[in-house]
């Protein structure tokens, strides 16, 4: 559907947005996010994420330069929604991605509202998420989320900006993810999410919900 190199199914869209950030950011880090977000995501970023020590700096996405102005040495990602709920003001994917890439900052986008219609990876996004509850499921019968890795972001080129993927991970035997995955392809981000964040936090998608979402994709 999205043309990524790997994906991770989780228990909800909220789990997908949280894990997408926590995979590369820790206490003392920050992300710059569009202020035009689904209310649940906005609250997650403003309150629980802040309580964990990850600062979320909200900016008006109508001017992409706002992302650059809010960036500092501890910024780990940019975040936006392709078609925000409820405003539906189109997010400037290409412009924001172009600001972040030279700095080693990936753009993470929520494409829940526009599967098939929009291909964020073609416009420079590095990672995307969906609440699979919506169009992927299609029937409102199941709750789930998914994180998709484009494989198009060079995490290894920015070790200072992306230490989570470029320094030994004590939770996984000291693995350096960008090195460990080289025989497998450009999957450092999504493999780390699967083997550490999902393992430790536990928001796995139920097998029955996964079956329902596959049925939804088929129809």
Role assignments for model-derived ranges:
Residues 1-2:
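Glycine-rich phosphate-binding segment of PLP-dependent enzymes
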């Amino acid at each position: 559907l999205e043309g990524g190199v790997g994906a991770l199914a989780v228990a909800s869209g909220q789990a997908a947005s949280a894990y997408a950030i926590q995979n590369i950011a820790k206490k003392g880090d920050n992300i710059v996010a569009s202020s035009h977000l689904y209310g649940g995501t906005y609250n997650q970023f403003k309150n629980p994420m802040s309580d964990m020590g990850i600062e979320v700096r909200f900016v008006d996405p109508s001017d992409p330069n706002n992302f650059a102005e809010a960036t500092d040495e501890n910024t780990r990602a940019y975040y936006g929604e392709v078609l925000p709920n409820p405003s539906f003001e189109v997010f400037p994917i290409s412009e924001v991605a172009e600001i972040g890439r030279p700095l080693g900052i990936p753009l993470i986008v929520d494409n829940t509202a526009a599967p098939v219609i929009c291909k964020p990876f073609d416009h420079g996004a590095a990672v995307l998420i969906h609440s699979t509850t919506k169009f992927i499921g299609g029937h409102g019968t199941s709750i789930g989320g998914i994180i998709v890795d484009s494989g198009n972001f060079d995490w290894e080129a920015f070790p200072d900006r992306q230490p989570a993927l470029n320094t030994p991970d004590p939770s996984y035997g000291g693995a350096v993810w960008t090195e460990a995955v080289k025989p497998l392809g450009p999957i450092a981000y999504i493999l780390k999410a699967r083997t550490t964040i999902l393992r430790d936090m536990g928001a796995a998608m139920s097998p029955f919900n996964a079956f329902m979402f596959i049925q939804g994709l088929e129809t």
